[in-house]
Amino acid sequence: MQAAGFDVLCNPFGTLYNPLSIVACLERAVENRLMEDNDLMRHDGLWHSWLHHSRFSHSDKDVCLARCNEAVGQTYSFLKRKPLLIVTLGTAWVYYYQGRVVANCHKVPPRQFERRRLNVGEIVSAWQPLMERLACAVLFTVSPIRHLADGAHGNQLSKATLLLAVDALTEVLPQAGYFDSYELLTDEMRDYRFYARDMCHPSEVAVDIVWERFREAYMSADTREQVRQREKEFRQSQHRTIVNA
């Protein structure tokens, strides 16, 4: 979307996968509630935040804290503009550390975590009060990327839980919508040529098709034409001129 000319704030806390961690980050951003020293933990010589991706980690606690709070402030400012908030849910499996849901395990030994799959009610109960506070529309998607650590059946149960939770939210909250990227890849593009070499992630062709369907669903003809032009200009800007000596 950035290449198409849209003003986008993408994954300000880093890539998040489970519904509860996304809620925790958005709640903090809505309140502009900054992180404090006791929100960080130290492991393997680095300071980390349980809410943030490892790219925020640093050997200096103050640097780590500043990076994390910059993300909180950026998200707060962006939400004040009442944007379209697109939320992609990846998995219903969550990790708990000392009773607290974490977004990233930061290579802490697995035995220190409790891991379990959320149920539909838990996801809805976490998201509904947050969405009632958000002054913007929320468009949910469910990631078609397969998480196969628990096998194919475990992945299906996780995705089904997310789909049912999103369906429940869109039934009761008028500002909530759903874009069917999951169904596009798993139903319409069942052929493995639409998957990358790892057989879990979508291929570039699949991503292009999903993006095309998104444009058709949510953009006017004029906007789609502007997007095509912006994308063309972006591709041209990425080409390097080769000069023969």
Question: Where are the model-predicted features located?
Answer:
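Extracellular glycan-modifying ectodomains
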Residues: 1-245
